[in-house]
A protein has these predicted regions:
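Positively charged n-region of N-terminal signal peptides that target proteins for export
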Residues: 1-7
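Bacterial N-terminal signal peptides
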Residues: 7-19
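Flexible coil/turn and secondary-structure edge motifs
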Residues: 22-144
Length: 144
């Protein structure tokens, strides 16, 4: 009986401890222009812990870079931003994103042309959707 409780405690400790220690870690997905440029810009922001380039959307499973860059897969070049929300808010990341890209260009960003380079935020919560929509409307209203 003693071993049962010890095993149960250790299981709970191992399974739930990482979640407790990473409670302030959040993830956001942004796309706009070349993902390497966006990756470098997000990596400079205090509170950002990791930035990884990749693809989202599309109709091809496990697309190759050459196919995505041709615009034939329907994917967007995106970055996954892992951040500590005690050090930087999602809203601050969105404001930084609007400055990194050209949100008024429907066919890419700067010299990167095509749907795969279009500006997009893939939100993963209602809060992220609200912040993304609200800040875009404010940007539109500012006519900047």
């Amino acid at each position: 009986m003693k071993n049962y409780f010890l095993r149960t405690f250790l299981y709970a400790f191992v399974v739930f401890l990482p979640e407790l220690t990473l409670a302030s870690e959040r993830i956001a997905y942004f796309g706009g222009g070349c993902f390497w440029c966006t990756e470098a810009d997000f990596a400079k922001i205090a509170g950002v812990q990791d930035v990884v380039s990749g693809y989202m959307g599309g109709h091809v499973v496990d697309p190759a870079y050459t196919d995505v860059s041709k615009g034939t897969t329907g994917h967007y070049e995106i970055v996954k931003v892992v951040y500590d929300d005690k050090k930087v808010s999602f809203e601050n990341l969105v404001h930084a994103f609007w400055r990194m890209i050209d949100p008024t260009d429907a066919d890419g960003s700067f010299c990167d042309r095509g749907q795969q380079y279009s500006s997009v935020i893939f939100y993963n919560s209602d809060r992220q959707k609200l912040v993304s929509t609200r800040t875009l409307k404010a940007l539109d209203a500012s006519e900047k």
